[in-house]
Curated annotation (Swiss-Prot):
Role noted for this protein: Necessary for normal cell division and for the maintenance of normal septation.
Keywords: Cell cycle, Cell division, GTP-binding, Magnesium, Metal-binding, Nucleotide-binding, Septation
NCBIfam families, alphabetized: GTPase_YsxC (TIGR03598)
Record-level Gene Ontology MF annotations: GTP binding; metal ion binding
Family: Belongs to the TRAFAC class TrmE-Era-EngA-EngB-Septin-like GTPase superfamily. EngB GTPase family.
Residues the record lists as binding Mg(2+): S42, T64
Gene that encodes it: engB
SUPFAM superfamilies: P-loop containing nucleoside triphosphate hydrolases
UniProt-listed Pfam families: MMR_HSR1 (PF01926)
Protein name: Probable GTP-binding protein EngB
Length: 206
């Protein structure tokens, strides 16, 4: 099979769901984007798709409370999961989000991979590690994307990547670590190549 290369610039908004029960049919391949409320998820999705307003960004962390689905091509979807861990969100709502996230990662059959976004200056917080555990226990491949990479010098970036790669060894899953800066598009090509690989089974010839 020749390598597929999807055009993420054609991605369009599909639908929003308040919980897993409201999601569309469990078919095709979905790739989920998860992260703390200030990790830059919406900004990363906008950089990937080269669309300024595809995923709505906000100065108020925790605004994305719904599961938002975007279609790259038929049967190829990106899923923007609710941001987790923001202090100003009521405890009850936080617990509800965490329950939904765990349920989605464990039960969604068409989930082909998970991108966990973390601010490169504050990686691997407790809730990030919880998400990694859930994904690994569900046998899902993971990409840990260290965002806002332009905030660090190149040597500090390399050092952080090395530290994160060593720290995740005990999880023993299929986990890769990359950096991303939406500001100067650093790492967007590597992100799209990883997504292409995860979507590839959709295009396998019979």
């Amino acid at each position: 099979m020749s390598e597929i290369k999807l055009n993420y610039h054609k991605t369009r908004f599909l639908t929003s769901a308040a919980n897993i029960k409201q999601l569309p049919e469990d078919s095709g391949i979905e790739i989920a984007f998860a992260g703390r409320s200030n990790a830059g998820k919406s900004t990363a999705l906008n950089a990937l798709t080269n669309q300024k307003n595809l995923a709505r960004t906000s100065k108020t962390p925790g605004r994305t409370q719904l599961i938002n689905l975007f279609e790259v091509e038929p049967n190829c979807k990106l899923v923007d999961l609710p941001g987790y861990g923001y202090a100003a969100v009521p405890e009850q709502m936080k617990l509800q989000w965490q329950k939904s996230l765990g349920e989605y990662l464990q039960k969604r059959e068409c989930l082909g991979g998970v991108v966990i976004l973390m601010d490169i200056r504050h990686p691997l917080k407790a809730l990030d590690q919880q998400m990694i555990e859930w994904a690994v226990s569900a046998d899902l491949p993971l990409l840990l994307l260290l965002t806002k990479a332009d905030k660090l010098s190149q040597s500090a970036r390399s050092k952080t990547v090395k530290m994160v790669r060593e720290a995740i060894l005990p999880f023993q899953g299929d986990i890769q670590v990359e950096t991303l800066s939406a500001q100067n598009k650093l790492g967007v090509d590597r992100l799209s190549a990883k997504l292409d690989a995860w979507f590839a089974p959709n295009f396998a010839t019979e």
